[in-house]
Amino acid sequence: MTLQQFPDACAFQPAMPKSKRWVSGIPTMELHLFWPTVGPMLERAIEHGDGGIKRWQIYDALKELKLQLWVGRVGMEIEGVLVTEMQIRPTGKVCILRHACGEDAAAWIKEGLPLIQAWAKAEGATVMELQGRRGWAKIMGKPWRERWVVMQRSL
């Protein structure tokens, strides 16, 4: 896949989509154009998660380049949203797939994974991590593996 790197952290774009379904990184300067569509979509992902983050916090972190926004498309129609985060740990940089939602998310994430992996590697990441519900382990398949379980209870 031919990549064009834009000045923004996650703005890798495929030169020509190989299928009707494709993924692209959204440059921060274009965030305001996409947010009316992707913001409500992310709300659904937040509701299915632990509620530890609000939509406006994601928006602010995207504007501050702490998170990266990716959209899955069919043609020009936005089908889904993925948020990534780069973390620096003692063992190196890790690219975390954090919030994913939309129609047929598994299909477009798998389609766009090579692009996201190329971006993460170019940014110096040596590991990719997905944080989500247990069903993602089956969707991602090999070479992904479940490393630990996070348990939680209300007080």
Language-model region placement:
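Active-site/acyl-donor-binding loops of N-acyltransferases
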Residues: 2-4, 130-155
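Short amphipathic alpha-helix that is part of the acyltransferase structural core
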Residues: 2-53
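Long, low-complexity, intrinsically disordered polar/charged segments
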Residues: 40-53, 89-100, 152-155
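Active-site rim helix/loop that mediates acceptor-substrate recognition in acyltransferases
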Residues: 46-69
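Conserved donor-binding loop and adjoining core beta-sheet/short helix segment
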Residues: 64-106
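Short, flexible, glycine/charge-rich loop motifs used to bind or transfer phosphoryl groups or to couple energy/partner
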Residues: 59-60, 85-87, 118
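Acyl-donor binding region in acyl/amide transferases
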Residues: 90-141
